[in-house]
Amino acid sequence: NYIFNNNMMSERPEVNKDIFWKQQLSNEVTGRFYAFRKKPINIIKKMEEIKKYCSNNNIKLIFISPPTHVDLQNKINQYNLNKEYILYKEYLKSTGILLDYDVANDITQNSENFNDPYHFSEGIARAIAKDVSVFF
């Protein structure tokens, strides 16, 4: 009953939210997402080019780490990727400005703020847009 696109399930479920939530956190979905993580050498090279271009042209480089529900954040530890995740965020901070919303807090602990563990609600999107707008 699910539509697969690039090996990921559609975020528009035909089942109730609780069932879909559990499916999104399953090894079938989240496990596949985290299972084959490796250092993205090509992406890092491109990022260095972008960083240099922005620096040479006085452009602010801003990254947004969008919020995910803590149920999904906890999967990083489950798949032993905490060290890599910290390095990833440190790299983004060293490259530009990082607005990091993917941290455990009152917002990310409340499932009402999310359509599923990966996707936040429209209200959260508006709050993030307001935060980001101060940079423009």
What does each model-found stretch correspond to?
Residues 1-53:
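Secreted/periplasmic serine-hydrolase-like ester/acetyl group-modifying domain
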Residues 40, 69, 108-110:
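Alpha-helix initiation/capping motif
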Residues 51-78:
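Active-site segments of SGNH/GDSL-like serine hydrolases
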